[in-house]
Amino acid sequence: MGSNSASRARALLVAATTVLALFSSAIFSSGPVAQTDVTTGIKATSTMKSPLLLARFRGEGPVGALPSQGRAVARKDFELSGVFNVADVEPLDAKPAPDPSLAGNVRVEGTVQPGDGAAFFRFHGVAIDVATGEVALDRTYPFNDGTLRETMHRFVDDVLETLTGERGIAETKIAYVRQDGRVKEIWVMDYDGENQRQVTHDRSLALSPAWAPWGSELAFTTFKRGNPDLYLFDLTRGASYPFSTRPGLNTAPNYSPDGKWIACTLSRDGNAEIYLISRDAQTAKRLTRNTVIDTSPTFSPTGREIMFTSNRTGSPQVFVMDVEGLNQRLVTIEGSYNDSPQWSPKGDKICYAARHDGIFDVIVMDANGSNPIQITANAGHNENPHWSPDSRKIVFSSSREGKRQIFMMNADGSDVVRLTGDGECFNPAWGPRPKDKLAVKG
């Protein structure tokens, strides 16, 4: 099952209440699977990448292994960007002469030096257009022993933004659910799988993390009081507090782009419906009114539309509606089971999990419902896709190596990288870039 779907189903069975059992049987029943006309794109050629010549970083003065350590972080960031093919070269002693035959090639040099004052060290990074010999980026970053990784992430993102006009994702984080035994907790890690740390410590079931646009808060569902309630976790303070504890389901949170509203699923009226709850928790607006299940809401980048999953056609399908709940219409017309939609930050694509012959795979399609392309295949269940902030990557959970873990891939399905390994991990949610974060909470 889809990770939002499967995890919710298992959790609802534990809750063992009438409304939860109704929800589970309605949306997670196993019916016949229809044939589809979804294009399989997994064999397609990946987007063309630009050559990047990454020089060995120099060290000046007593800086120890920092140059090699920093370069290793930068190299991984450049590779994971999906933009560059990285080649290792030796550093230059002088500015290189222009070489028009190498149009599109970029050379990156770096030097670590002792710092002064509060900064123990300085990193001087340069990016050069090999064809013209012009310096595209020349910047110095102060750092200390504990901030080398984030300094390299910032440098790589600066290079990406300078060369492509689109900031990279190296400074972002991913929230997810990790299961150990019967306990499910919320965890957070760097985008590359490093610095994994546990967020909740409730010894219960925590599911469906969602990032606030300002990047220091998570919404999630927890069963720690018996009912599936929505809580908010302040990552700065390290504390959680209840947001929606209405009777029945309080699940599948998703923040509006301005942070003023949280879309979610509530069953307080006896049926699972999509609601908008104001960030101050004072106002709740019901958007759907059906005798079926509506769940998994996700906002468009403009905040004017909401995509969601509904089984109103007889099986789970992706629908879209205006933020007021009007103009509800079907998006997916291929396949008998489509769930967990996510709108790309650029707004032109969506991704979701689709079941074919009992197996879940990730589909990417145009936001208007056309051109569905299957980007995973022959690798276990692949579920809960979520876009990176630059729309170039998708993070997802997969059972391709046995138990579910978090993986990352390019938006065309290429360059798959495993990010987690301990426990069983699913429900990934990609956080905002620092420069995208809202300065003021909604």
Describe each PLM feature range.
Residues 39-102, 107-108, 114:
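Short beta-strand->alpha-helix linker/helix-N-cap micro-motif
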Residues 96-158:
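Amphipathic beta-strand/beta-sheet edge segments enriched in Tyr/Trp
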Residues 168-170, 213-214, 257-258, 301-302, ...:
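Residue-level detector of Asp-centered blade-edge/turn motifs that repeat once per structural unit
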Residues 174, 218, 259-262, 303-307, ...:
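Hydrophobic beta-strand positions that form the internal "hydrophobic ladder"
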Residues 401-442:
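Blade-level signature of beta-propeller repeat domains, shared across WD40, Kelch, NHL, RCC1
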Residues 131, 190-194, 234-238, 278-282, ...:
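Short loop/turn segments that connect beta-strands within beta-propeller blades
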Residues 167, 178-185, 201-204, 221-230, ...:
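A flexible loop/linker signature enriched in serine peptidases of the S9 family
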